């Protein structure tokens, strides 16, 4: 009931704020402010006009509090919670005002409000002695994991940590509503992972589904999300059931041929359709959560090896066009975004290299020349010899050794000597007698696209990712780590 009332306050505040924004942009003083030539004076005038219309964080907070008071339902939500709902509206509206996001949308009753929070342990109060949340006179016990991490994060019963933000979150898990409490505590969080210093460097070569990693003492080649499989067959069956349900409930919305009628139509949804819709959403949620967990574990393993990460700038839109399902399942762009965010929070470095200038897939440090290769050729002949190295691994090695935006052949050779033996053991480097002449390129293109893994996916899951997945893979993943992160005493397949 309180969350539904919070949704109405959110929509009322957003509607009023959008109306004020329209009036402000149509006003004469707003248009005249853009005629001011000096940038600092123009920005100051625009900010003054915006404050006059109440379009700032505290203005929308007061607006939401007034809507709460006028509703006559002050017993459902407190003054503090209403103000923070206004702050949430401002964060959405601010992106729209400064052209960093689209027009904010109203929250429907079906979608609802997902969270409510308060700062300073007021309104929504966390009681550490009771391990409970107290809100509007009700006490809600929390199920807290009794682990060392939670004990250190929350503090002891005698000296609990001060709560900065207490947030109640509503989630749909397994087609049921679940309620969680999120706490932001004062101070530094407990250390879960010890990251390497920034003096250590690792190079990444990120593809639509896999990532190659090379540093002077570590090399790896794995899927971005080994267990982030999307159950396409189940999704297809659910969508067919939903389509049949819609046809049964809305026969007047279809032509005799079976096509939907053009124009605006009113669709009736049965309870069975709503149940199928929740099941479909839960399938996508499971895949997204598994993908997020795999990305986080892989990022932690990367930063445990090196504090500086070099990678090429990539056109992720091209991946979506050419490798649609792989891009959706593995989410390489999301992986890079989380990698940058983790590096920023941990005071580490992620360097994006110029792809057009360095041309990793074409360069050969032995001859210091550039040779274009077709996409299907996944092996590189090192210096024109009979030594073949995986194209992805070699690109990651080149990225690791970039100095001042240029290739450094001396550093590349030193790194190559350090990891060559391990790469041979894992099958990423091969010595094959190659034919000469035009048959050479044809032979390279016909080689297996990916090398055989040096270790089983179960071993990598145990040693690298450290957690068990709730989604079992439906195919055999080729995953390999060599160097520090894996036991290289095992013999390759």
Task: List the predicted regions and their residue ranges.
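A generic secondary-structure signal for well-formed alpha-helical elements
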Residues: 10-21, 93-100, 210, 407
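Residue-level detector of alpha-helical segments with a strong bias toward transmembrane helices
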Residues: 21, 111-115, 215, 402
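Short, flexible helical or helix-coil boundary motifs
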Residues: 25-28, 41-46, 53-57, 67, ...
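Amphipathic alpha-helical surface "interface" segments used
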Residues: 29-43, 104-122, 261-262, 268, ...
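Acidic carboxylate diad motif detector
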Residues: 35-174, 329, 333
């Amino acid at each position: 009931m309180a969350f539904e009332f919070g949704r109405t306050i959110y929509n009322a505040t957003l509607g009023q704020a959008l109306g004020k924004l329209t009036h402000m942009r149509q006003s004469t003083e707003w248009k005249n402010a853009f005629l001011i030539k000096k940038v600092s004076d123009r920005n100051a005038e625009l900010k003054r006009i915006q404050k006059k219309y109440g379009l700032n964080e505290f203005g929308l907070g007061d607006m939401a509090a007034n809507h709460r008071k006028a509703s006559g339902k002050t017993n459902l939500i407190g003054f503090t919670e209403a103000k923070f709902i206004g702050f949430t509206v401002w964060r959405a509206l601010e992106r729209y005002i400064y052209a960093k996001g689209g027009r904010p949308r109203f929250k429907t009753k079906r979608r609802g409000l997902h969270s409510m929070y308060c700062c300073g342990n007021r309104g929504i109060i966390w009681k550490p002695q009771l391990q409970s949340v107290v809100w509007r006179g009700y006490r809600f016990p929390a199920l807290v994991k009794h682990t060392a991490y939670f004990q250190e994060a929350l503090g002891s019963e005698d000296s609990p940590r001060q709560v900065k933000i207490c947030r109640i979150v509503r989630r749909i898990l397994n087609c049921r509503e679940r309620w969680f409490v999120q706490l932001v505590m004062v101070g530094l969080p407990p250390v879960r992972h010890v990251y390497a210093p920034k003096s250590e460097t690792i190079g990444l070569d990120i593809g639509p589904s896999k990532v190659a990693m090379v540093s002077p003492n570590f090399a790896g080649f794995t899927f971005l999300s080994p267990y982030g499989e999307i159950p396409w067959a189940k999704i297809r069956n659910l969508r067919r059931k939903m389509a049949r349900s819609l046809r049964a409930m809305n026969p007047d919305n279809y032509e005799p041929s079976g096509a939907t009628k053009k124009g605006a139509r009113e669709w009736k949804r049965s309870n069975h359709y709503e149940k199928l819709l929740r099941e479909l959403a839960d399938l996508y949620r499971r895949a997204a959560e598994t993908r997020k967990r795999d990305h986080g574990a892989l990022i932690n393993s990367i930063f445990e090896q090196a504090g500086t990460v070099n990678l090429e700038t990539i056109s992720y839109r091209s991946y979506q066009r050419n490798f649609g399902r792989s891009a959706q399942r593995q989410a390489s762009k999301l992986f890079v975004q989380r990698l940058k965010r983790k590096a920023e929070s941990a005071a580490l470095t992620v360097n994006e290299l110029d792809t057009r200038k360095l041309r990793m897939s074409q360069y050969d440090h032995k001859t210091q020349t550039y040779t274009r290769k077709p996409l299907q050729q996944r092996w590189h002949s090192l210096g024109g010899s009979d030594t073949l190295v995986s194209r992805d691994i070699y690109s990651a090695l080149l990225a690791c050794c970039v100095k001042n935006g240029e290739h450094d052949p001396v550093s590349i050779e030193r790194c190559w000597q350090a990891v060559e033996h391990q790469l041979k053991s894992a099958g990423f480097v091969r010595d094959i007698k190659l034919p000469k002449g035009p048959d050479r390129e044809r032979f390279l293109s016909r080689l297996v696209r990916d090398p055989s893994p040096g270790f089983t996916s179960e071993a990598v899951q145990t040693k690298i990712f450290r957690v068990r997945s709730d989604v079992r893979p439906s195919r055999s993943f080729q995953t390999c780590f060599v160097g520090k992160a894996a036991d290289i005493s095992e013999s390759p397949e």
